């Protein structure tokens, strides 16, 4: 019955079978890149090892229907400093020149909406070996009461690698081992992870002054070669020592040229010098040459720490730092502090008053303050005190304190900051003290408490400050914790009380606080007010686009909903059909007025004329947004079934193949029933397509439909387009590319022929113990300079696209060289098998073609089953070889090179089947006649008659 079903499947071009083939996604990860090794640590742990800078290729093989969508994600590995995720929506993940930080666990997530998603993972281990670093440390200790000293040297070798490196220490060319003698010790320091090894030379002896090599190895994993570093230890080896040509703190005036020299005072080997600057890089124009640093025309922005570092891998690096200070004065501010003891916030006669002055200076401690009253220097007295460092204010702040304020103390006070003897200009600020000097108040102008603007427009928030003097206004946000102002600052100063915002966005909406500053005015509790900013923006609706399918004659309801907007309401809704304005929907009773958050349109019955694009434009008086509906009775696209087992079926003695195309119909009940499908078949790289109509009966959801594509040419690929048709007309088209793939040549009840058209060559492999390999080629890939008068011009089919396997016997091949092509391993399930194949042996130097059977029952044993030698003419001939393996076996085609270069041998169309070979062998000298060459064929009626008789015999 199984054979009957298979034959019926082949005879009937189309049929429907099965229900509910929808299946959840299944996934499996395989590698296809430059992997060193893939280890299976346990059932759930797979490790993919790859060398750094190689190409990572992972494939997620999926099954399930509909075809699952694949997404790759990654979590951080050991070399990554933080969690990271990358998404790749493709079945193949490819990373060129992979870096160590890209190691980690990769997840393949496959989902198709049926059941739960399938998630598989694999850990990618990136292997690398950096250059080792060797440092030398020396210690000297007193022994036996200072009678003599012991000198101990530590050679520390560090390397970054994965996997952990193996360390080999050498003195000269001799390898050192742990405790080799009393003077040598090798150990791993504490708190290291295998990346460091120390060679300790105790009580240094004359023979210890030598060349030492640290060789690191990862045991050639991934082909990574060993690396080494060498150090020459002498009795003059010493760490670096430095001194500077200037003081550690260097104060200069702006515009001067600065030169600092870093001088070596010791070190063997000769140390390397390096200049750096913090924070940031060296200034533009700065020149570091050896130990000399030059900065022309220095400016205030060039202030900072300049570091000179000397290294020679002996001891610790030597470092000297110069703190460069470029004199500058900026940001002069003052404060008026009423009598703090009496907690007063106003200036009153008879109470104390303090005026403070501060300037941001470099160097801060060198600034000099002077106070003036009404243009004359202020003189200290019992009632007028001047302090340089007020402990209640920022460092180096000068204060002038008036005790028991009198009317005569009113006037204009000026604070001047300077660097005596420096060309830096003085900086001054003045404050007027009078009966009109009052603390500030702040308020929001009338009508400005709420500011409403459209998104993208400028906005201005304003607070008015009254008082004398008027301090700056500081702005901040209130309603959002830790929120920053549009400028990126948490607090922004405005001199006129106006906060100007350019091109506001919706996230700028909220409450803003304005408050008085405690500088350049009264040093009292800040006064504050609030301004509300409202940003209006156009509405956002859903769905922005929706595909609505419905059968003809059924009602349709279209709804456009408001998601967000400011204001959050629908002011108007306008419907259009194919660009034409529709009349407003009928007015509903007051109790059923449509809610303000959506708009609806009802179609009583869908017709061909009412199918098309509908637009709903929703407005909130600020802007509008559109819902787009594509309404039709079109059928959804077919869903190709990709899990068909062995969809490709090749035909013996021809270069045609058939393909089993299977699919389901997506949501068949959503529209009118599918009447037929239109199938378009186009060979890739060609323009013409063949179109067929496939009638069907009522299609159920999940029902698997099938059609066998015949007369496809090996090894071409085809584009398949499938379109469903209903009473409405053509539905959505689905397309896919089908490729010819040869199955692994497993013996079965039916003949299974390998044409070598696929790169996988049916699972055949090249033997690793022979002298050279078989080559797969066709007439299009032949070497134009190949030897004439040998080898076939085409394969057995006579088409230029057809492939075959052959041995090239030109140089450097020699007499007796062997090439072996080994089949997959077969499990013997029958007593007899027959191996059929075509061979081509043409040329005066033809050697031998042998067929061997490799038995793997008890060990490995190769047995000769067939052999042929010499020139057999420029024709393809067929051989049938019976074999009777006793257990699992492989067949081997062995080509042996003859006495010269005119000895190419080819094979094609290898078939392995159960049972005995045909008793009547084909004449080995008879040319095989291919289809289309004029050979007689059975008519279709004769074929049907023979098949019918065969089916009746099977049923009996």
From Swiss-Prot:
Q: Does the keyword Disulfide bond apply?
A: yes
Where does it reside? Answer: Cell membrane
What membrane topology is annotated for this entry? Lipid-anchor; GPI-anchor
For this protein, the record's CDD domains field holds: Ig, MAM
Main localization (coarse): membrane
One of the GO BP terms on file? regulation of synaptic membrane adhesion
Stretches assigned to the Fibronectin type-III domain: 627-744
Which terms in the GO cellular component ontology are assigned?
A: axon; cell surface; dendrite; GABA-ergic synapse; Golgi apparatus; membrane raft; plasma membrane; side of membrane
Q: Where is the Ig-like domain?
A: 24-123, 132-230, 240-323, 338-432, 440-532, 539-650
Q: Which cysteines are joined by disulfide bonds?
A: 60-108, 157-214, 262-308, 357-415, 463-514, 560-616
Q: Does the keyword Transferase apply?
A: no
Q: Which UniProt keywords apply?
A: Cell membrane, Developmental protein, Differentiation, Disulfide bond, Glycoprotein, GPI-anchor, Immunoglobulin domain, Lipoprotein, Membrane, Neurogenesis, Repeat, Signal
What domain of life does the UniProt record list for this protein's source? Eukaryota
Tell me which residues make up the MAM domain: 752-919
Glycosylation, residue list: 42, 235, 247, 257, 307, 432
Residues forming the propeptide are: 934-956
Provide the tissue specificity: Expressed by neurons in layers 2 and 3 of the cortex during their migration and settling in the cortical plate. Also found in layers 4 and 6a. From 9.5 dpc-13.5 dpc, detected in the marginal zone of the developing cortex. At 16.5 dpc, modest expression is found in the intermediate zone. At postnatal day 1, evident in the superficial cortical plate. By postnatal day 7, expression is limited to layers 2 and 3 throughout most of the cortex.
Which Pfam family, any one, appears in the UniProt record?
A: MAM
Question: Which SMART domains does the UniProt record give?
Answer: IG, IGc2, MAM
Question: Subunit comment for this entry?
Answer: Interacts heterophilically through its MAM domain with proteins in axon-rich regions and through its Ig-like domains with proteins in differentiating muscle. Interacts (through the Ig-like domains) with NLGN2.
Q: What name has this protein been given in UniProt?
A: MAM domain-containing glycosylphosphatidylinositol anchor protein 1
* Taxon lineage: Eukaryota, Metazoa, Chordata, Craniata, Vertebrata
